[in-house]
Amino acid sequence: MAWYDNAVFYHIYPLGLCGCAHENDGQPVPGAFKKLDAWAEHAAKLGCTAIYIGPLFESGSHGYDTIDYRLVDRRLGTNEEFKQFVAACHERGQKVIVDGVFNHVGRDFFAFQELKEHRENARYRDWFCDVNFWGNNEYNDSFSYGNWGGFNLLVKLNQRNPEVQNYHFDTIRFWVDEFDIDGIRLDAADVLDFDFMKGLRRVANEVKPEFWLMGEVIHGDYSRWANPEMLHSVTNYELHKGLWSGHNDHNYFEIAHTMRRLQGLCHDTRLYNFSDNHDVERLPNKLRNRDHIRHIALLVYTLWGIPSIYYGSEFGIEGKKEWGSDWPLRPCLELADYTDAEKTNPVTSIYAALGRLKAECPELSWGEFKELTLTTQSYAYARVLDGKAVVAVYNNGDSPVSMEFQLPVEASGVEDLLADCVGSQPILTQVEWGKLKVQLPSNYATLLRLVG
C-alpha cells in the first residue's frame, strides 16, 4: 500500500505560525524555518507521519494570491531553507505536502502585470478568464476579469489554456526537483477544470512514485474528484460538519449517516478527515460542550480515512473569525508555551495516545468498519482485521449510558486503550455470551481492544 494510506497529517499554516506580516513587506521573520522544523519534530512526537504546510510561495498577503510559484515567500525565508526543511522531515520519516494554488493568482503575478500593461495586445491575455475591456473594477484597471469568490485580488486562471496547464505542470516538476516534496493539496479543487486535474494526475504519476494529490472540495459527490483518473483524496468537509453539529445536537445518526453515504459514494478512497483547519473556526468555539473534543479526536482517528491535526488543535486552543478575517484562525504560537501539555492537558494527551495507537494498531488503518450500535446519544463501531478488533464507544449525553452489542470477533475481555490519558475515567465492561456490555460516564468516549 502507498504511504498515504496509513498517514497521519499535521497541518501548518506557516505565515500565521511564524507571525509574518499580513501584507508582504519582503522582510523574513528571523529563524522562521528553524521554528517550522521544531513544530514538525513536535508533530512527529504526536505520531504525525506527514506535514501539510502551506501556502508557502511568494504572495502579496495571505498566501493564496500567488505572485511567484517558484520562490518561497520571502517572509518565511529562502528556497534553500525550505529544501533543508523537507530534508529534515524526510530524515524523521515524514512526508511533506504543499499548497498548489492553481485556480487563481495575485494581481502582481507576471502574466497579469503584462495584461494590465498591454491590454488587448497582451501576450498573456488568454491566460485569464472573462477578460472584458468594456468593464472596470475597484482597482480602476479599465477592464474586468474572472476571479475566485468575488474577490478581484484573486485573478482566475484559464485552466483550459494549454500554456497555463504546462506552466503548472512545470511548476510541479520544479517543486519535486528543487525541494523533493511528496504531494500537493490543491486549493479550490472544487472549481478546477476536470481535464486539467487529469493532467495533474499524469504529471504526479511521472514525477515521483506515490506522489499524492489531495483537493479542497466542500460539497458534492467526492468521487467526482477523488478517483483513479484525477485526485487521490479530497477534504472531508461533509464529515467535518457532522462531527461538531452531531455533538451539539446530540445526534450520532448524523455522523453515522455521513459515513454510510461516503462509503457508498467513495468506496475504498481515503478522504482527508479533519476537525478544524485554517478556514474554519476551532472546535472550542463551535462545540457547546468542550468535553466532546475528545470524542471528535477519536472519531477522526478511528473512522475510515486519513486523520489530521491542525497546528494548535492538539492543545485545544480557541480560534474564531473576527470581522470576516481568517487571521484569528492562523495564530502565531510558541512551542515553549506548551512544554508539559501531554502530561497536563487532556486534549494533548488524547492526541498523543491516538498517534501512538495509529502506529501500533493496524486495525485502525486497514480494518473493516463495522457499526455495532447507534442511538442519538450513544455510538459504537469496530475496526476488524484478521480476527482482531478495536471498538470505539461514545456517549454525548449529560447522563451515563449503557450499551450492549454483539462482539465483532471472539473475545473474553477488553482493554481500555486510553485509560492512561489525562482526564480519562473508569468504565464498566462485561463480556458474556458473545456480547459486550459497556457503561460510559456522561460526555465520554474511549477506545477498547478486544482480548482473549
Regions inferred by a protein language model and the residue ranges of each:
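Solvent-exposed beta-hairpin/edge-strand motifs
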Residues: 408-423
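Loop/helix patches that line or flank the sugar-binding groove of alpha-linked glycan CAZymes
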Residues: 2-6, 23-24, 28, 255-412
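Active-site-proximal helices and loops of the catalytic beta/alpha 8
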Residues: 90-92, 113-116, 187-267, 318-353, ...
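C-terminal beta-strand-rich structural cap/linker in extracellular carbohydrate-active enzymes
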Residues: 430-452
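Substrate-binding/active-site clefts of carbohydrate-active enzymes
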Residues: 1-9, 13-49, 56-173, 178, ...
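Active-site groove signature of glycoside hydrolases
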Residues: 104, 168-194, 273, 277
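Hydrophobic faces of well-ordered beta-strands that scaffold small-molecule active sites
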Residues: 8-11, 51-53, 96-98, 184, ...
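Short, well-ordered coil/turn segments that N-cap beta-strands
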Residues: 47-49, 92-94, 180-182, 208-211, ...
